[in-house]
């Protein structure tokens, strides 16, 4: 499962490191290529809200194997895309995999291991996420410069097939535990918003991911045009972001146990400051590396905090909570990358980064409100 997460995260965000060459070959703007992340987010939302209903009584092992197969198909479609529409079709398919897999991840972990080992299982799942964050962007950028962006995407296909073979051998049969529609009904899932802490928390979570991807989706064009570095150096900067993010994932657990809400307030506030600081420091390479390293440290570790929050906010309905979280996160990523694309094409990096800073600041405020409301209702 961790290998599958690695391939999934690498597939989802590979375009971030390859925007420039992809845009040139597909003969569209960098903003339009960035919409490949937006469309994957849209289809992830639709899938997360409906996967349990559509799967019905299907054995969950079969469903997971099918999703992993679809991930390999998506990678091949993108790598072989003759034009923009086929590229977007491949990105839509990876969105289906994202929504289906992540909405089932917590429930799957609960069925694979004893209750006492569920947190450890989820941590192992996230290990694949952290590893992909470390290597996907810089490796994608490097491979893109050596074998082209198509070759970089095609390299994900054997990884997905390896994950499929591993799951085929290791996953036990997992019968559907609920009647059709019990867990996947859209209206059932959205009743969670009747809880004020959940509603405010989801708003804070959504604005965090929106602000993050307004900026991060277009970091390569910023590095090339403002900082003035080439593809090889871009790969090194992305590696710094990834390594810092991996370190952040390892470190954040020390803060969540005693200061969950404080952590969720501070992280977006610091990232807003970083987004604003990148503008005056953009031409200074050393400063950009330090700032983006801090961005990676904070941004990659934050999802661990938000998944810990949803487990605390909805402890008795992991599947509904997981589906709702995926829907909110992926909608926010789609909106953020779309907004970032529009801003980058019309206002350049300055407008893009300032909006990202503002949205992240809003996330910090909403997280603070969530903490206050939660303390009053418990």
Predicted regions and their residues:
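Paired small-residue
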Residues: 74, 85-94, 286-294
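Helix-loop-helix hairpin linking two adjacent transmembrane segments in secondary transporters
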Residues: 84-86, 115-116, 123-172
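Helix-breaking motifs and short loop linkers at transmembrane-helix boundaries and internal kinks
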Residues: 27, 59, 80-86, 228, ...
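A late C-terminal transmembrane helix in Major Facilitator Superfamily
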Residues: 313-349, 356
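Cytoplasmic helix-loop-helix junction between adjacent transmembrane helices
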Residues: 90-130
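Helix-to-loop junctions at the C-terminal end of transmembrane segments
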Residues: 47-59, 248-260, 344-345
């Amino acid at each position: 499962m961790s290998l599958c997460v690695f391939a999934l995260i690498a597939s989802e965000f590979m375009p971030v490191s390859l925007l420039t060459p992809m845009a040139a070959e597909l003969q569209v703007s960098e903003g339009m290529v960035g919409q490949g992340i937006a469309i994957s987010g849209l289809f992830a939302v639709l899938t997360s809200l409906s996967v349990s209903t559509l799967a019905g009584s299907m054995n969950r092992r079969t469903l997971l194997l099918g999703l992993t197969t679809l991930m390999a198909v998506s990678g091949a479609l993108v790598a072989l895309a003759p034009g923009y529409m086929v590229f977007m079709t491949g990105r839509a398919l990876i969105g289906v995999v994202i929504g289906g897999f992540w909405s089932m991840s917590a429930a799957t972990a609960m069925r694979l291991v004893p209750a006492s080992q569920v947190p450890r299982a989820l941590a192992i799942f996230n290990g694949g996420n952290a590893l992909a964050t470390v290597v996907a962007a810089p490796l994608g950028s490097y491979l893109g410069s050596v074998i082209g962006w198509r070759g970089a995407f095609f390299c994900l296909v054997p990884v997905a097939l390896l994950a499929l073979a591993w799951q085929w051998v290791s996953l036990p049969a997992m019968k559907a535990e609920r009647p059709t529609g019990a867990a996947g009904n859209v209206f059932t899932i959205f009743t969670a918003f009747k809880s004020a802490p959940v509603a405010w928390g989801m708003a804070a979570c959504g604005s965090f991911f929106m602000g993050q991807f307004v900026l991060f989706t277009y970091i390569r064009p910023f590095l090339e045009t403002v900082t003035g570095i080439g593809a090889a150096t871009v790969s090194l900067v992305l590696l710094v972001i990834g390594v810092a993010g991996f370190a952040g994932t390892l470190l954040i657990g020390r803060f969540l146990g005693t200061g969950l809400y404080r952590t969720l307030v501070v992280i977006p506030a610091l990232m807003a400051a970083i987004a604003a600081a990148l503008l005056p420091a953009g031409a200074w390479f050393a400063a950009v590396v330090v700032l983006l390293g801090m961005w990676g440290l904070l941004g990659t570790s934050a999802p661990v905090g938000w998944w810990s929050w949803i487990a605390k906010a909805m402890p008795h309905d992991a599947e509904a909570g997981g589906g709702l979280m995926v829907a909110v996160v992926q909608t926010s990523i789609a909106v953020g990358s779309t907004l970032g694309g529009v801003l980058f094409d019309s206002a350049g990096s300055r407008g893009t980064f300032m909006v990202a800073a503002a949205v992240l600041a809003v996330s910090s405020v909403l997280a603070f409100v969530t903490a206050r409301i939660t303390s009053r209702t418990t």
